[in-house]
Amino acid sequence: FSNTGFALIYNDDLYKKKIVSKKLENRDLLIFQKNLKKGTKVRITNVLNKKTVIAKVGSNSKYPLFNNSVVSIRISKELELDIDEPYVEIVEILNNSMFVAKKAKTFDEEKNVANKAPIDSISVNDLNAKKNKKKKISKTANFNYIIKIADFYFIDSAKSMIQKIKKETSLNKNKILLKKISNTQYRVILGPFLNKKSLQKAFNDINILNFENIEIIKNAKNS
């Protein structure tokens, strides 16, 4: 399993407001992810800066459809996530993976150091305050995403999916596109979206069709 999308950075207000149904501790190396079983090991990558951590999936928790996961404050700090653009890739790691063995060992060593450092006082705003000041000017210009619905082997299958989306949703028809990846791969996408609000609305609208693994993908500048 793999998925790219926007994580939700946990804080207690989300639990109090019932946006998420379970708690995460600040120090946890846990995430909530609805497609994966509790205890599954995952590699989480901040796609924007390529920083990576290994974590485990926690208990089943409700959280907004738009988000592909809920991550602890500790994970967000390790990845240096941008609160306005917490774009991550989540990859399930198989138990027999050599990568897991290496990373788990390294992370255990890091954990001994990290556990000694106070983290309870860190807020989501604190994590990104300095970075936001530097990036404020260019952030809007760099926000450009598409929603990947599915890949198809046959172009007719992809076209049928587009017709289904047009018929059964209220999405802007000009945003529903067919992209040829190769001679045997045709991708149905929505977009592009140049701000988070429009991206989130389209993502929530398409979810009435109950697709299993919709992904949000950073759009290449000239695509």
Predicted segments, located by residue:
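Secreted/periplasmic proteins
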Residues: F1-I146, Y153, S157, I216-A220
